[in-house]
């Protein structure tokens, strides 16, 4: 039986969108709340709950007496694949099938031997949970996991529809220069082009699942008692200010992986992780044998898929650069096929390259051997790179990765973009420039400046540190 002191704890139920890039920051935030004395209920879908057990072992989800894991259905058919589920499929299914199980879980928790649920922390694109918050009379904070610039861009989807920029007239608009159209009317986004908007605008169908999903999700922004963003003011102030009109309670509390310094001493939390793929820890030992700033780190994240031809072009570009590299390539990265890297590539690069399927990216990016990050420009990857002072070569795939790429290359001056139609010569040239060239040196220095500002944001008295304190006291613990 729980003690009186235990039963009086605030109880946060945390529910991420069921993809790796959303689960990680939600887990980091949940650990911070736990450090502040909250009882935590962390809710995955059934599919990812099972994947966590497979990747981290059955004990990974045992949690703690005050940090529990639960799962609810998402309405999709069962699958044993080691891959991210269909994003459109999830977006269509979750709002229809997850609300009642989520409400049932809250009711069960409220009737059990744990403190009653006192607040909901929901992913910003899981706004169906607001109906549960209303039903149980609970405050709900919406955690939007993209960058602030990506978040701002999503909030203008409705304007793009109303002004008839989208949907596209026909598929020729994807290649005829139309996406270069400059939009000078969006506050906080100077010189932004259609191509820099999150990719779900690239449709000719007004009923497109993803376009409509974000139109609906952004309409829910004012309904959260607060919005949290995994960024810091010095980096994205210009993108945050315009969104305050939609919800004045916006808290920038990132980089969240750096905020973990306040909970790292808690041994009880060490076994609680969120990687859905089994990590290869040997890559750190390999990096230990390399000189500072000598290794190209390549990782296109948990969702990106590419053609076999693109995979081969990236491979030979890396090989021809003659630089050491660590390449993380998921088995499912080539759409519908097992990722097969040519044997002759492996032979050519065996002395200077390591290829593996997954790693602890935070550990890799803070390793002194890493000189540049070849990335898909997902936000977790981007902010982890920024906060470790590592410049980037950007190959955005979908969602707000296009926006992040634009800001890295133009606003923050820490990145070069590779064309979607990737060619080995361009990969080789950009790797050499970033590792040896004058532009690369300038971007490295700029990245180190941003690293310093990120460290200041999360230090005691820094902007993100204070915002987290205010969020807890003024929102989550407010009676």
Curated annotation (Swiss-Prot):
Q: Name one GO molecular function term.
A: quercetin 7-O-glucosyltransferase activity
What CDD domains does this protein map onto?
Answer: GT1_Gtf-like (cd03784)
PROSITE patterns for this protein: UDPGT (PS00375)
Q: What is its EC number?
A: 2.4.1.-
Q: Which UniProt keywords apply?
A: Glycosyltransferase, Transferase
Task: Please give the InterPro entries that the UniProt record associates with this protein.
Answer: UDP_glucos_trans, UDP_glycos_trans_CS
Residue positions binding UDP-alpha-D-glucose: 302, 358-359, 376-384, 398-401
Instruction: Specify the superkingdom.
Output: Eukaryota
Question: Which enzyme class?
Answer: transferase
Q: Name one Pfam family in it.
A: UDPGT
SUPFAM superfamilies according to UniProt: UDP-Glycosyltransferase/glycogen phosphorylase
- Function comment: May glycosylate diterpenes or flavonols in leaves.
Q: Which family does it belong to?
A: Belongs to the UDP-glycosyltransferase family.
Family matches, as PANTHER family: GLUCOSYL/GLUCURONOSYL TRANSFERASES, GLYCOSYLTRANSFERASE
In its UniProt entry, what is this protein called?
A: UDP-glycosyltransferase 85A8
**Origin organism lineage:** Eukaryota, Viridiplantae, Streptophyta, Embryophyta, Tracheophyta
């Amino acid at each position: 039986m729980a003690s009186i002191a235990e039963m009086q704890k605030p109880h946060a139920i945390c529910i991420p969108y069921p993809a790796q890039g959303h689960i990680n920051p939600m887990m980091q935030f949940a650990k911070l709340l736990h450090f502040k004395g909250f009882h935590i209920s962390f809710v995955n879908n059934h599919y990812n709950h099972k994947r966590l057990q497979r990747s981290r072992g059955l004990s990974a989800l045992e949690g703690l007496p005050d940090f529990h894991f639960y799962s609810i259905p998402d309405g999709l058919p069962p699958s044993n694949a080691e891959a991210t589920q269909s994003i459109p499929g999830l977006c269509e299914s979750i709002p229809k099938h997850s609300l009642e199980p989520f409400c049932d879980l809250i009711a069960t928790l409220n009737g059990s031997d744990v403190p009653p649920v006192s607040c909901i922390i929901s992913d910003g694109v899981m706004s169906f949970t607001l109906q549960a918050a209303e039903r149980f009379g609970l405050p709900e904070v919406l955690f939007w996991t993209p960058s602030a610039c990506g978040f701002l861009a999503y909030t203008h989807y409705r304007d793009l529809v109303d002004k008839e920029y989208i949907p596209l007239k026909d598929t020729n608009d994807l290649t005829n220069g139309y996406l270069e159209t400059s939009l000078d009317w969006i506050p906080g986004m100077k010189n932004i082009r259609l191509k820099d908007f999150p990719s779900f605008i690239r449709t000719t169908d007004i009923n497109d699942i993803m376009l409509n999903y974000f139109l609906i999700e952004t309409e829910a922004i004012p309904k959260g008692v607060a919005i949290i963003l995994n960024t810091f003011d010095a980096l994205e102030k210009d993108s945050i200010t315009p969104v305050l009109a939609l919800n004045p309670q916006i808290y920038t509390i990132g980089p969240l992986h750096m905020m973990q310094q306040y909970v790292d001493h808690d041994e009880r939390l060490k076994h609680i992780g969120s990687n859905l793929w089994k990590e290869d820890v040997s890559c750190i030992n390999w990096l230990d044998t390399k000189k500072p700033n000598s290794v190209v780190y390549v990782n296109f994240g948990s969702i990106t898929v590419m053609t076999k031809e693109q995979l081969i072009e990236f491979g030979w570009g890396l090989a021809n650069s003659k630089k050491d590299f660590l390449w993380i390539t998921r088995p499912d990265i080539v759409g519908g096929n097992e990722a097969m890297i040519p044997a002759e590539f492996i032979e050519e690069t065996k002395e200077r390259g390591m290829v593996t399927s997954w790693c602890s990216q935070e550990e890799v990016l803070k390793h002194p051997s890493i000189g540049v990050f070849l990335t898909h420009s997902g936000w977790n990857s981007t902010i982890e790179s920024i906060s470790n002072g590592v410049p980037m070569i950007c190959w955005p795939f979908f969602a707000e990765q296009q926006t992040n790429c634009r800001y890295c290359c133009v606003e923050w001056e820490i990145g070069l973009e590779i064309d979607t139609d990737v060619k080995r010569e361009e990969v080789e040239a950009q790797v050499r420039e970033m590792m040896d060239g004058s532009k690369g040196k300038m971007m490295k220095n700029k990245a180190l400046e941003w690293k310093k500002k990120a460290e200041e944001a999360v230090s005691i008295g820094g902007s993100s540190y204070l915002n987290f304190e205010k969020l807890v006291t003024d929102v989550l613990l407010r009676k």
